Each structure stands twice: as C-alpha cells, then as structure tokens.
C-alpha cells in the first residue's frame, strides 16, 4: 500500500537545509513556556538557530515558529552543534569556516580551516542556573534519582554513566529502585522508561 509523504512540521517561511544541530529545550534555566521547543541550526542561507514550539498533533506533532533564537551577520558563521550543559545553559558550536561542503570546494582547499571555531554559551539571565546533578562517581541511588530530573541531557549523561558500570551491580539495584517507586505518583511511567533505558 502507498504511504503518503509525512507532513512537514516547519512552515515554508522557516524551513532550513539539513543541519547537524538540533536540540529540544529541556532545562529549568529557561522559561516554562519554551520547554519542549525544538532548536534547529542552519549553516547555508539563514545562518543561525530557529526556535519552534512543539505540540501534540493527533498521531504526530505540530510545530509553530517562535523566533530566530540566534542570527549571525558574519558570512562565515556556521552553527553546527548545541547541547544543554549540566547547569542548564545552552552551549553552541560555531564551525566558523569560509567554506561549506565539499561539492563546490576541494577537500584540500587551503581556505578550509580544520583547527578554529567558536563556542558560545547562552543563558537566561533572569532565571537561576540549574544545580548540576552528581554523575561521575555518584552512588547508584543518586544516579537512579537523576533519572527523575526534568533535564533530558542530565538523564542522558546519567544513563551513559550507568552503562559504564557493571551489569551485576546495576541491575539488582535498579530493580529495587523501580519496585520502590510509587505507581500513583506523577511521572511514574516516565521513571519506568528511564529505568529501562538506564539498565540497557
């Protein structure tokens, strides 16, 4: 059977070319109303970061352009990656290169810069930074509790730490932690998913 093309989530006026930088807002350092927004970099044409709200849309999602979070006026500005830090601030990587791609320029072009770039830190001054959760060297109990935190990147880093520990140590403790969760508490299913991924 024929499957129709998926609905494009981004409005025509704000579409960007394929990009290597994409992040969902998941930080208590930023306002509540932007949690879950998607941030998308672009390095050709529009040089910057667009922000779109994301909402449930039936069996998928719907989005709406919120703002140009960042726009460069330097023709070499190449935002290529971003990630929320343990303190909730947003770090952005700018490749800052005169050349883009390898179709129109040789990979050996002397103008291709392999060593320079820029890193920006974006904060929301009227809100406090997030207290970083202990991860490296933290107890299993602390790591499991981190899985309840609202910051996706903290949960991600916690899962990576758990995966580096012995299965024989983690799984029995994780099972005890899951069995101790309150099935009627808010976020219960979310915590179960975190435990599943943390024990993988």
Where are these regions (language model features)?
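Hydrophobic core/packing positions within alpha-helical solenoid repeats
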Residues: 162, 192, 196-199
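Buried hydrophobic core positions in alpha-solenoid tandem helical repeats
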Residues: 142-144, 173-178
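Alpha-solenoid helical repeat architecture
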Residues: 146-151, 178-187
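Residue-level detector of extended alpha-helical repeat arrays and alpha-solenoid scaffolds
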Residues: 154-155, 188-192
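Beta-propeller domains with acidic blade repeats across secreted/periplasmic ectodomains
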Residues: 1-145, 153-157, 161-165
């Amino acid at each position: 059977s024929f499957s129709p093309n998926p609905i494009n989530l981004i409005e025509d006026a704000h579409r960007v070319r394929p990009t290597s930088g994409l992040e969902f807002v998941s930080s208590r350092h930023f306002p509540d109303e932007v949690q879950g927004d998607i941030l998308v970099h672009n390095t050709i044409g529009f040089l910057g970061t667009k922000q779109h709200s994301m909402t449930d849309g039936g069996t998928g999602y719907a989005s709406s352009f919120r703002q140009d979070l960042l726009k460069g006026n330097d023709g070499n500005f190449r935002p290529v990656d971003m990630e929320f830090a343990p303190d909730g601030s947003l770090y952005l990587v700018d490749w800052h290169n005169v050349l883009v791609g390898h179709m129109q320029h040789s990979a050996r072009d002397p103008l291709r810069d392999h060593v320079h770039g820029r890193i920006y830190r974006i904060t929301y001054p009227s809100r406090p930074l997030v207290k970083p959760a202990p991860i490296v060297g933290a107890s299993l109990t602390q790591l499991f509790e981190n899985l309840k935190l609202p910051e996706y990147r903290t949960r991600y880093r916690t899962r990576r730490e758990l995966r580096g520990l012995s299965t024989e140590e983690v799984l029995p403790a994780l099972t005890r932690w899951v069995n101790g969760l309150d099935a009627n508490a808010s976020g219960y299913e979310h915590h179960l998913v975190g435990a599943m991924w943390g024990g993988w």
